[in-house]
């Protein structure tokens, strides 16, 4: 699919797949789709072989796209760059001799600070790509001309709730958080998307959208009004708060016999919270157990 998409915007594409049957299947599919500007090769790409390098040099690409295998020889998932196959870090010196631009597609589980450290100053951006709230890929854009800190980009690709945000780690670190002093009925409670959390976007959300963070390690936010960015946040309206403890569990469970529940930054799992509340799953209500405004509490909300 990647090469098929590239072929729609590029003059020509070189597709390499070391697995013979998979390569043959791709070649047949390209032909059936009427794609004529893709050439398929079947090289084993490694620092110890050079057939693939000769082909790549002859092709002279403007961009090199690499999607290394994310499983080891035993079929286990791997997340470190050096554990993927091929090891991109060992190939980079050769790749830079051939092209000025490299795009890597990596596991959504890969650690972004690790990628920034391993890939060095030529890393222009790390892009967290999500669809319908689920992080699908990490894309790393490397350019020979780039030097310095990479941009961190979030992109939600949903047709109905697209969203994008760009920032840098230094901007995040330099932005002071704004903390909520109270949580009351009528407030809007906001849960950031998994893509924002993956990118490490926390304090900037306060500055850019006028939000208040519930506490340092509770990645929930409050606002007087819904910012109206469904691709970035799930929004809830606060109905009532309860103390975190037996009395609060009993009262919240009685008021909300059916609700979704989530524990965040408290010494309970979500399953344990449900057991303490004696609340059945389902319904329009959502009960959060979290640390907020310097104390642990229960926050009962309705979805917006």
Report the location of each language-model feature.
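SAM-dependent transferase fold signal centered on methyltransferase-like domains
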Residues: 1-304
């Amino acid at each position: 699919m990647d090469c098929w998409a590239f072929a729609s915007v590029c003059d020509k594409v070189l597709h390499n797949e070391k697995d013979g049957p998979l390569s043959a299947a791709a070649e047949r599919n390209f032909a059936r789709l009427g794609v004529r500007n893709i050439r398929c090769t079947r090289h084993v790409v490694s620092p110890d072989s050079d057939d693939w390098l000769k082909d790549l040099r002859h092709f002279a690409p403007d961009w090199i796209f690499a999607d290394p295998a994310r499983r080891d020889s035993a079929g286990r998932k791997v997340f470190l760059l050096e554990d993927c196959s091929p090891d991109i870090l060992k190939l980079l010196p050769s790749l830079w001799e051939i092209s000025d631009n490299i795009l890597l597609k990596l596991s959504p589980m890969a650690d972004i600070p690790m990628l920034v450290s391993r890939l060095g100053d030529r890393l222009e951006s790390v892009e967290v790509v999500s669809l319908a709230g689920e992080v699908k890929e990490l894309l790393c854009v490397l350019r020979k001309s780039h030097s310095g800190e990479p941009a961190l980009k979030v992109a939600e690709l949903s047709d109905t709730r697209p969203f994008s945000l760009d920032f840098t780690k230094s901007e995040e670190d330099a932005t002071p958080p704004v903390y909520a002093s109270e949580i009351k009925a009528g407030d809007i409670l906001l849960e950031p998307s998994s893509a924002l959390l993956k990118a490490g976007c926390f304090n900037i959300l306060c500055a850019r959208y006028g939000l208040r963070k519930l506490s340092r390690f509770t990645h929930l936010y409050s606002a007087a009004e819904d910012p109206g960015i469904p691709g970035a946040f799930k929004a809830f309206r606060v109905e009532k708060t309860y103390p975190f403890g037996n009395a609060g569990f009993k009262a919240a469970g009685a008021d909300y016999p059916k609700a979704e529940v989530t524990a965040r930054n408290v010494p309970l799992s979500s399953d344990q919270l449900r057991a303490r509340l004696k609340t059945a799953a389902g319904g329009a209500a959502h009960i959060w157990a979290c640390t907020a405004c310097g104390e642990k509490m229960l926050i009962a909300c309705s979805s917006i």
